Amino acid sequence: MDTNDAASRLEALGNPTRLSLFRALVKAGHGGLSVGECQQRLAIAQSTLSFHLKALIHAGLVTQERQSRTLICRANFDLMNALVGFLVDECCVEERCRTQASDAA
């Protein structure tokens, strides 16, 4: 993942409704939630849910699968883990380098 990819995904999560929706899908696990369940949990209008789902799907953070007459939404856990990894991958690297340099001196 590069900086532009991470930025676009973080931008999608930067909206409180989308973040709440994504967190609900993460909590639901790999089984996901139906669109109706998402709407009930967030207590938002169908049109509002569709708008925010579209943004999360476009960012690759959510997938949808039709099961008979039900649309199931799932968090993309691989992408979520990659995004978290991108954020923490170099955590405190410069601090460690400074510490190692001062220890060597």
Feature locations, PLM:
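N-terminal helix-turn-helix DNA-binding core of bacterial DNA-binding proteins
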Residues: 4-45, 66-79
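A generic local structural motif
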Residues: 8, 58-59
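Alpha-helical residues within the helix-turn-helix
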Residues: 40, 57-58
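Short coil turns linking two alpha-helices in DNA-binding domains
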Residues: 45, 50-52
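Amphipathic alpha-helical dimerization/coiled-coil segments
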Residues: 1-5, 23-27, 77-105
